[in-house]
Protein backbone atom coordinates (compact mmCIF):
# COMPACT_ATOMS: atom_id res chain seq x y z
CA UNK A 1 0.00 0.00 0.00
CA UNK A 2 1.68 3.19 -1.15
CA UNK A 3 -0.44 5.63 0.83
CA UNK A 4 -3.50 5.89 3.01
CA UNK A 5 -6.46 8.21 2.97
CA UNK A 6 -6.28 8.27 6.74
CA UNK A 7 -8.49 6.70 9.34
CA UNK A 8 -12.16 7.44 9.36
CA UNK A 9 -12.39 7.34 13.15
CA UNK A 10 -10.05 8.37 16.00
CA UNK A 11 -7.17 5.90 16.55
CA UNK A 12 -8.20 3.31 19.08
CA UNK A 13 -5.79 0.42 18.94
CA UNK A 14 -6.50 -0.28 22.59
CA UNK A 15 -10.06 -0.93 21.53
CA UNK A 16 -8.93 -3.85 19.39
CA UNK A 17 -9.00 -6.09 22.45
CA UNK A 18 -12.64 -5.21 22.94
CA UNK A 19 -13.35 -5.90 19.29
CA UNK A 20 -11.64 -9.28 19.50
CA UNK A 21 -13.83 -10.05 22.49
CA UNK A 22 -16.86 -9.02 20.45
CA UNK A 23 -15.75 -11.36 17.67
CA UNK A 24 -15.23 -14.32 20.01
CA UNK A 25 -18.76 -15.71 19.51
CA UNK A 26 -18.09 -15.62 15.77
CA UNK A 27 -14.89 -17.68 15.98
CA UNK A 28 -14.22 -19.47 12.74
CA UNK A 29 -13.28 -23.11 13.08
CA UNK A 30 -10.10 -23.88 11.08
CA UNK A 31 -10.91 -25.92 8.00
CA UNK A 32 -10.60 -29.65 8.41
CA UNK A 33 -8.17 -31.66 6.33
CA UNK A 34 -11.05 -33.26 4.44
CA UNK A 35 -13.20 -30.25 3.58
CA UNK A 36 -16.66 -30.94 2.20
CA UNK A 37 -16.68 -27.87 -0.04
CA UNK A 38 -13.94 -25.82 -1.65
CA UNK A 39 -15.19 -22.51 -0.27
CA UNK A 40 -17.74 -20.95 2.05
CA UNK A 41 -18.52 -17.53 0.54
CA UNK A 42 -20.47 -14.64 2.02
CA UNK A 43 -21.52 -11.96 -0.46
CA UNK A 44 -22.01 -8.72 1.50
CA UNK A 45 -23.82 -6.09 -0.59
CA UNK A 46 -24.08 -2.37 0.22
CA UNK A 47 -27.66 -1.04 0.40
CA UNK A 48 -26.88 2.21 2.23
CA UNK A 49 -28.63 5.48 1.42
CA UNK A 50 -26.16 6.27 -1.38
CA UNK A 51 -27.48 3.27 -3.35
CA UNK A 52 -30.65 4.19 -5.23
CA UNK A 53 -33.34 1.77 -6.42
CA UNK A 54 -31.83 1.31 -9.86
CA UNK A 55 -28.35 0.67 -8.45
CA UNK A 56 -29.82 -1.78 -5.96
CA UNK A 57 -31.41 -3.72 -8.81
CA UNK A 58 -28.18 -3.71 -10.84
CA UNK A 59 -26.31 -5.29 -7.93
CA UNK A 60 -28.87 -7.96 -7.16
CA UNK A 61 -29.61 -8.91 -10.74
CA UNK A 62 -25.90 -8.96 -11.52
CA UNK A 63 -25.23 -11.47 -8.75
CA UNK A 64 -28.26 -13.58 -9.68
CA UNK A 65 -27.17 -13.76 -13.31
CA UNK A 66 -23.64 -14.68 -12.29
CA UNK A 67 -24.94 -17.83 -10.60
CA UNK A 68 -26.80 -18.72 -13.78
CA UNK A 69 -23.73 -18.19 -15.94
CA UNK A 70 -22.21 -21.29 -17.54
CA UNK A 71 -18.62 -20.18 -16.89
CA UNK A 72 -19.30 -19.64 -13.20
CA UNK A 73 -21.09 -22.98 -12.87
CA UNK A 74 -18.26 -24.75 -14.69
CA UNK A 75 -15.76 -23.20 -12.27
CA UNK A 76 -17.86 -24.26 -9.28
CA UNK A 77 -18.13 -27.81 -10.59
CA UNK A 78 -14.38 -27.94 -11.19
CA UNK A 79 -13.71 -27.41 -7.47
CA UNK A 80 -16.47 -29.73 -6.26
CA UNK A 81 -19.00 -27.13 -5.13
CA UNK A 82 -19.22 -24.15 -2.80
CA UNK A 83 -21.49 -22.92 -0.02
CA UNK A 84 -22.71 -19.37 -0.59
CA UNK A 85 -24.84 -16.83 1.30
CA UNK A 86 -25.80 -13.28 0.41
CA UNK A 87 -26.51 -10.52 2.91
CA UNK A 88 -27.32 -6.83 2.61
CA UNK A 89 -25.83 -4.20 4.86
CA UNK A 90 -26.03 -0.51 5.59
CA UNK A 91 -26.21 1.04 9.08
CA UNK A 92 -24.92 -0.38 12.37
CA UNK A 93 -27.92 -2.58 13.12
CA UNK A 94 -28.99 -3.11 9.53
CA UNK A 95 -27.67 -6.36 8.11
CA UNK A 96 -30.07 -8.88 6.63
CA UNK A 97 -29.67 -12.25 4.93
CA UNK A 98 -31.23 -12.12 1.47
CA UNK A 99 -30.32 -15.64 0.34
CA UNK A 100 -29.37 -18.11 3.06
CA UNK A 101 -26.68 -20.77 2.81
CA UNK A 102 -27.02 -22.75 -0.40
CA UNK A 103 -24.72 -25.49 -1.63
CA UNK A 104 -24.11 -24.68 -5.28
CA UNK A 105 -22.65 -27.51 -7.29
CA UNK A 106 -24.39 -27.42 -10.66
CA UNK A 107 -26.68 -25.37 -12.86
CA UNK A 108 -29.83 -26.30 -10.96
CA UNK A 109 -28.48 -25.23 -7.57
CA UNK A 110 -27.03 -22.09 -9.12
CA UNK A 111 -30.47 -21.18 -10.46
CA UNK A 112 -32.01 -21.95 -7.07
CA UNK A 113 -29.63 -19.49 -5.40
CA UNK A 114 -30.37 -16.88 -8.07
CA UNK A 115 -34.10 -17.32 -7.43
CA UNK A 116 -33.57 -16.64 -3.71
CA UNK A 117 -31.79 -13.40 -4.55
CA UNK A 118 -34.55 -12.24 -6.89
CA UNK A 119 -37.21 -13.07 -4.31
CA UNK A 120 -35.61 -10.78 -1.74
CA UNK A 121 -36.79 -7.25 -0.99
CA UNK A 122 -34.59 -4.36 0.02
CA UNK A 123 -34.13 -4.63 3.75
CA UNK A 124 -32.90 -1.14 4.63
CA UNK A 125 -30.92 1.95 3.81
CA UNK A 126 -28.95 4.19 6.11
CA UNK A 127 -25.36 5.04 6.90
CA UNK A 128 -22.34 2.97 5.86
CA UNK A 129 -21.18 0.61 8.61
CA UNK A 130 -18.56 -1.54 6.90
CA UNK A 131 -17.15 -2.82 10.19
CA UNK A 132 -20.56 -4.08 11.29
CA UNK A 133 -21.09 -5.65 7.87
CA UNK A 134 -17.86 -7.61 8.32
CA UNK A 135 -18.96 -8.69 11.80
CA UNK A 136 -22.26 -9.96 10.37
CA UNK A 137 -20.45 -11.79 7.58
CA UNK A 138 -18.12 -13.40 10.11
CA UNK A 139 -21.12 -14.56 12.13
CA UNK A 140 -22.65 -16.04 8.99
CA UNK A 141 -19.46 -17.98 8.26
CA UNK A 142 -19.66 -19.55 11.71
CA UNK A 143 -22.97 -21.08 10.64
CA UNK A 144 -21.85 -22.37 7.26
CA UNK A 145 -23.32 -25.85 6.74
CA UNK A 146 -20.09 -27.60 5.71
CA UNK A 147 -16.40 -27.61 6.45
CA UNK A 148 -14.72 -25.52 3.77
CA UNK A 149 -11.17 -25.40 2.47
CA UNK A 150 -11.44 -21.59 2.29
CA UNK A 151 -13.62 -19.01 4.00
CA UNK A 152 -14.17 -15.81 2.06
CA UNK A 153 -16.12 -12.58 2.52
CA UNK A 154 -16.80 -10.67 -0.70
CA UNK A 155 -17.87 -7.15 0.26
CA UNK A 156 -19.04 -4.59 -2.28
CA UNK A 157 -19.85 -0.93 -1.73
CA UNK A 158 -19.77 2.62 -3.05
CA UNK A 159 -18.55 4.54 -0.01
CA UNK A 160 -16.29 4.70 3.01
CA UNK A 161 -17.50 3.75 6.48
CA UNK A 162 -19.04 6.63 8.38
CA UNK A 163 -20.31 4.85 11.48
CA UNK A 164 -19.46 1.82 13.59
CA UNK A 165 -16.21 0.02 14.39
CA UNK A 166 -13.15 0.58 12.25
CA UNK A 167 -13.20 -1.83 9.31
CA UNK A 168 -9.46 -2.48 9.51
CA UNK A 169 -9.75 -3.70 13.11
CA UNK A 170 -12.55 -6.12 12.23
CA UNK A 171 -10.67 -7.19 9.10
CA UNK A 172 -7.51 -7.94 11.09
CA UNK A 173 -9.42 -9.99 13.64
CA UNK A 174 -11.15 -12.03 10.93
CA UNK A 175 -7.90 -12.49 8.99
CA UNK A 176 -6.34 -13.90 12.17
CA UNK A 177 -9.07 -16.55 12.13
CA UNK A 178 -8.26 -17.55 8.56
CA UNK A 179 -10.97 -15.55 6.77
CA UNK A 180 -10.08 -13.78 3.52
CA UNK A 181 -11.86 -10.51 2.71
CA UNK A 182 -12.08 -9.46 -0.93
CA UNK A 183 -13.63 -6.23 -2.16
CA UNK A 184 -15.50 -4.70 -5.06
CA UNK A 185 -15.29 -0.91 -4.90
CA UNK A 186 -17.82 1.07 -6.94
CA UNK A 187 -16.24 4.45 -7.69
CA UNK A 188 -19.36 6.31 -8.88
CA UNK A 189 -19.39 8.84 -6.03
CA UNK A 190 -15.95 8.40 -4.42
CA UNK A 191 -13.20 8.02 -7.05
CA UNK A 192 -10.58 7.27 -4.38
CA UNK A 193 -12.58 4.43 -2.81
CA UNK A 194 -10.23 1.79 -4.21
CA UNK A 195 -7.39 3.15 -2.06
CA UNK A 196 -9.62 3.10 1.00
CA UNK A 197 -10.73 -0.49 0.38
CA UNK A 198 -7.13 -1.57 -0.22
CA UNK A 199 -5.94 0.01 3.03
CA UNK A 200 -8.88 -0.46 5.35
CA UNK A 201 -11.12 -3.31 4.18
CA UNK A 202 -9.57 -6.18 2.23
CA UNK A 203 -7.04 -8.63 3.63
CA UNK A 204 -6.09 -12.23 4.23
CA UNK A 205 -4.61 -15.00 2.16
CA UNK A 206 -4.90 -14.15 -1.54
CA UNK A 207 -7.10 -11.09 -0.92
CA UNK A 208 -7.79 -8.83 -3.88
CA UNK A 209 -9.86 -5.83 -4.87
CA UNK A 210 -11.79 -5.21 -8.06
CA UNK A 211 -12.91 -1.68 -8.81
CA UNK A 212 -15.49 -0.42 -11.29
CA UNK A 213 -16.43 3.11 -12.30
CA UNK A 214 -20.18 2.73 -11.86
CA UNK A 215 -23.01 0.36 -11.06
CA UNK A 216 -23.57 -0.38 -14.76
CA UNK A 217 -20.29 -2.32 -14.70
CA UNK A 218 -21.26 -4.36 -11.65
CA UNK A 219 -22.68 -7.43 -13.41
CA UNK A 220 -19.57 -8.05 -15.48
CA UNK A 221 -17.33 -7.35 -12.50
CA UNK A 222 -19.08 -9.70 -10.09
CA UNK A 223 -18.95 -12.54 -12.60
CA UNK A 224 -15.21 -12.15 -13.07
CA UNK A 225 -14.72 -11.70 -9.33
CA UNK A 226 -16.56 -14.93 -8.58
CA UNK A 227 -14.43 -16.77 -11.14
CA UNK A 228 -11.32 -15.47 -9.39
CA UNK A 229 -12.59 -16.40 -5.94
CA UNK A 230 -13.75 -19.87 -6.93
CA UNK A 231 -10.41 -20.69 -8.54
CA UNK A 232 -8.46 -18.97 -5.73
CA UNK A 233 -6.53 -16.73 -8.08
CA UNK A 234 -6.71 -13.08 -9.15
CA UNK A 235 -7.53 -12.52 -12.81
CA UNK A 236 -5.95 -9.83 -14.94
CA UNK A 237 -9.10 -8.01 -15.99
CA UNK A 238 -8.02 -5.40 -18.49
CA UNK A 239 -6.53 -2.79 -16.20
CA UNK A 240 -6.18 -4.64 -12.92
CA UNK A 241 -4.05 -2.48 -10.67
CA UNK A 242 -5.08 -3.73 -7.25
CA UNK A 243 -8.28 -4.60 -9.05
CA UNK A 244 -9.24 -2.03 -11.66
CA UNK A 245 -11.73 -2.81 -14.38
CA UNK A 246 -12.69 -0.46 -17.18
Predicted regions and their residues:
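Bacterial N-terminal signal peptides
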Residues: 14-27
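Exposed acidic/Ser/Thr-rich ligand/metal-binding surfaces
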Residues: 125-176, 227, 246
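Short beta-strand-loop
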Residues: 79-116, 193-199
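VWA/integrin I-like adhesion module and closely mimicked acidic/polar interface patches used
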Residues: 74, 159-200
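N-terminal secretory signal peptides that target proteins for export/translocation
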Residues: 1-11
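Von Willebrand factor
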Residues: 36-100, 103-104, 111-156, 182-193, ...
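Von Willebrand factor A/integrin I-like adhesion domains
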Residues: 189-236
Amino acid sequence: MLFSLGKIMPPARAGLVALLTLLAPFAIIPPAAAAKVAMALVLAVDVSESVDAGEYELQHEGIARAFENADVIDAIQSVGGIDVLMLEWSDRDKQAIVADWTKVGDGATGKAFAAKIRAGKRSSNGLTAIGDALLAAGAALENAPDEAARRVIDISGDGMANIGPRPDDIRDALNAKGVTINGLAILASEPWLDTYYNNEVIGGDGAFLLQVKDFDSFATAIKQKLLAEISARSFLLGRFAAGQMQ
